Design a protein with these regions (language model features):
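Residues forming the ATP-binding cleft of Hanks-type serine/threonine protein kinase domains
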Residues: 420
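Formylglycine-dependent sulfatase
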Residues: 1-408, 413-414, 423-441
Length: 442
């Protein structure tokens, strides 16, 4: 490749795969991301390597499974000295790298996350849209400069208005980075907090989505008994019916947050157009993991591997270089993204990488769905002990084209789903004698 592209890597937090209008959801409002789908490749079966923030981010930043990089839980005090993160590899190869928002490879509880040898020359940190950090929180400083009180706004009836929202701040900083001079190619990693709980969009967006018009979660009454069997496996919230969760209202607020994301993402893409950089910029839209959103009686995240929790959006576009308007059903792991970006940037891929580049699909040289035979996700005591008390829950997911196996190690329980006939995973075949051979083979 004679010309190394810029890379705009936009990562939301806790966004499910089924939240894009162009990919089949008529209830969301995502016209800008919809256009990105038409302009590029949407990988419809992309899976994160952990349903929890830090291990997932450690994985896609390192190209390794969380267990391999030894960074398997939220609340870690440190990040290992090895391996180097992808931004360091890119910077060493001549890229000007910027970080906006959260990094979350280490704990940010009651402290600003310490820098590692990350390769970022532009660093605008905001772990979460709270004013919990006395120094080093660029977003809170930005709100104060405009006369706002972030914590008071969060508790107000109108919530944080769009003009002071963290998603808006991220766009402002992105525009600043894109417009500044760069001696060579750049990579900008934008990590916003939404649509992460507590699900408090600005009122102006919340009013656009009627809870009564929402489809609600994927739930059957039998899910209550199924979750009771998994009660010893970590989760952030109690099992409840959709009515007890007020799930339709939560879904409306969740979609409102995604609508605001779409509007602010548009401003960044417009800046690429205005500066004449769109044609030489690879654009990535993705998330770190999903959200239960009431499915199976669950809200938030934890040690489960249902589609809403581990399957995420991944859309990649490069005008004129990648195929357009293609939806790939290939099984993809999120750590494949780091391998792909190194490949596109002509940066040598370390031999220890566990990710596999998607470049041949993006360029239309291989449009089959044969990228991977299976995908893996892990949960190794991953939730912060604040939520679990350190229960010592360990589990792994093995998902093929047709089936999903979830093993909760040492708990004596598990899940096996026939995804062709039960795509929303309500019929657990784990104890079915007719599927014993399949379970053991998986």
């Amino acid at each position: 490749m004679s010309e190394r592209p810029n890379i705009l890597w936009y990562c939301t937090d806790q966004q499910r795969f089924d939240t894009i209008g162009a990919l089949g959801n008529p209830h969301v409002r995502t016209p800008v991301v919809d256009q990105l789908v038409r302009d590029g490749v949407a990988f419809t079966h992309t899976y994160c390597q952990s349903p929890i923030c830090t291990p997932s981010r450690a994985s896609f930043m390192s190209g390794l499974y969380p267990s391999r990089v030894h960074n398997t839980r939220n609340g870690n005090a440190t990040f290992p000295n090895w391996p180097p993160v992808i931004s360091k590899l890119m910077a060493d190869a001549g890229y000007d790298c910027g970080l906006i928002g959260k990094f979350h490879l280490q704990s940010s509880g009651r402290r600003t996350e310490p820098r590692i040898d990350d390769g970022f020359s532009y660093w605008k940190f905001s772990h979460a849209p709270r004013d919990d950090w006395e120094e080093g929180h660029d977003y809170a400083d930005w709100v104060r400069e405009q006369g706002g009180d972030l914590n008071a706004l969060r508790e107000s009836d109108d919530r944080v208005p769009t003009e002071l929202h963290q998603t808006t701040w991220a766009s402002e900083r992105s525009i600043e980075f894109i417009r500044q001079p760069h001696a060579g190619p750049w990579m900008l990693n934008v990590n916003i907090y939404d649509p992460h709980p507590p699900f408090i969009p600005p009122r102006s967006y919340a009013e656009q989505f009627d809870p009564a018009a929402m489809p609600g979660p994927h739930f059957r009454e039998s899910d209550m008994a199924a979750q009771a069997k998994l009660a010893d496996c970590d989760f952030q919230d109690e099992v409840r019916t959709p009515e007890e969760h007020d799930a339709h209202a939560v879904q409306a607020r969740y979609y409102a947050m995604i609508a605001q994301i779409d509007d602010q993402f548009a401003r960044i893409l417009q800046t690429l157009d205005e500066t004449g950089q769109r044609d030489n910029t690879v654009i990535v839209f993705t998330s770190d993991h999903g959200e239960a959103l009431g499915d199976h009686g669950l809200m938030y995240k934890g040690c489960r591997f249902y589609e809403g929790l581990v399957r995420i959006p991944l859309i990649i576009s490069w005008p004129g270089r990648f195929v357009a308007d293609h939806q790939s059903d290939a099984l993809v792991e999120l750590l494949d993204l780091s391998a792909t970006l190194l490949d596109l940037a002509d940066v040598e891929m370390p031999d220890y990488f566990q990710g596999a580049s998607l470049r041949s699909i993006l360029e239309g040289r291989d449009l089959s769905d044969a990228h991977r035979n299976f995908v893996r996700s892990e949960y190794f005591d991953a939730l912060d002990p604040h939520f679990t008390g350190g229960s010592g829950t360990y589990a792994t997911m093995h998902r093929t084209r047709t089936h999903k196996l979830c093993v909760y190690h040492g708990k004596g329980v598990g899940e096996l789903f026939d995804l062709e006939n039960d795509p929303w995973e309500h019929e657990n075949l784990w104890d079915d004698p007719a599927h014993a051979d399949l379970k053991h083979r998986l």
